[in-house]
Curated annotation (Swiss-Prot):
This is Large ribosomal subunit protein uL6. Belongs to the universal ribosomal protein uL6 family. Part of the 50S ribosomal subunit. HAMAP family: Ribosomal_uL6_A (MF_01365_A). The gene is rpl6. It comes from Methanosphaera stadtmanae (strain ATCC 43021 / DSM 3091 / JCM 11832 / MCB-3). The keyword Ion transport does not apply.
C-alpha cells in the first residue's frame, strides 16, 4: 500500500479569538477566557497564521492519522469554547424521597438520595466550570468541553443505583440537554 506523504488539517480561527503556539503548547484566548493545552507528539507539527491553525504530520502511520484528527478536534473545541461556551442541562428525578442538591465550593452535594442518611458527593472539574441548581434543574457551564462533560458525568455517576433495576428505580440526576450557546 502506498504511504501518504503528509496529512494536513486546517482549522479556521474566528476574528475575536487569538491562538498562540509555543512549541507544542497551544493557547487559545477569546471572550470567554483562556485555555492552554500541551500537544506533545513527536511527529505532529502545529502552526498558525492570522486566519488558520494547521495540524500536520509527514509520512503518517495509522496512529498518526488518528492523532491528527484528534488534535484538530481538541483545538476546534478550545476555539469554540472560548468563543461560545458549553452548557449542559440536567434534571433531578425522584419518586418518593425528595433529594436536595447543593453546590459547596468545588463539590456538588446530593442529600436524601433514596432516603440515604449520608450525602453523595460529586467533584466539579476545572476552575472555569460553574454549576447552578434551580429547583429540579442543574445547569453546568464552562469554556472547556472536557471539564464540563466530566463534571456532568461525575454528577450522574454519583446518583447511580447499584443492585436495583434502573428501569424501576429511576431516581437520579440525568442529562437532558447538551448545548453550545453564546457566552453572556
Amino acid at each position: 500500500m502506498v504511504k501518504l506523504a503528509d496529512i494536513t488539517e486546517i482549522i479556521p480561527i474566528p476574528e475575536d479569538v487569538t491562538v498562540t503556539i509555543n512549541g507544542s503548547e497551544v493557547t487559545v484566548k477569546g471572550n470567554g477566557g483562556e485555555i492552554k493545552r500541551n500537544f506533545n507528539h513527536n511527529k505532529i507539527t502545529i502552526s498558525n497564521d492570522e486566519e488558520n491553525v494547521t495540524v500536520k504530520v509527514a509520512f503518517p502511520n495509522k496512529k498518526d492519522k488518528a492523532m491528527v484528527g484528534t488534535i484538530r478536534s481538541h483545538i476546534s473545541n478550545m476555539i469554540y469554547g472560548v468563543d461560545h461556551g458549553f452548557t449542559y442541562k440536567m434534571k433531578i428525578v425522584y419518586a418518593h424521597f425528595p433529594m436536595t442538591v447543593k453546590v459547596q465550593g468545588k463539590i456538588v452535594t446530593i442529600d436524601n438520595f433514596l432516603g440515604e442518611r449520608s450525602p453523595r458527593k460529586a467533584k466539579i472539574i476545572g476552575d472555569d466550570v460553574k454549576v447552578s441548581v434551580k429547583g429540579e434543574d442543574v445547569t453546568i457551564t464552562g469554556i472547556n468541553k472536557e471539564h464540563v462533560g466530566q463534571t456532568m458525568a461525575n454528577i450522574e455517576q454519583a446518583t447511580k443505583i447499584k443492585g436495583r433495576d434502573p428501569r424501576i428505580f429511576q431516581d437520579g440526576i440525568y442529562l437532558v440537554d447538551k448545548r453550545q450557546e453564546e457566552l453572556e
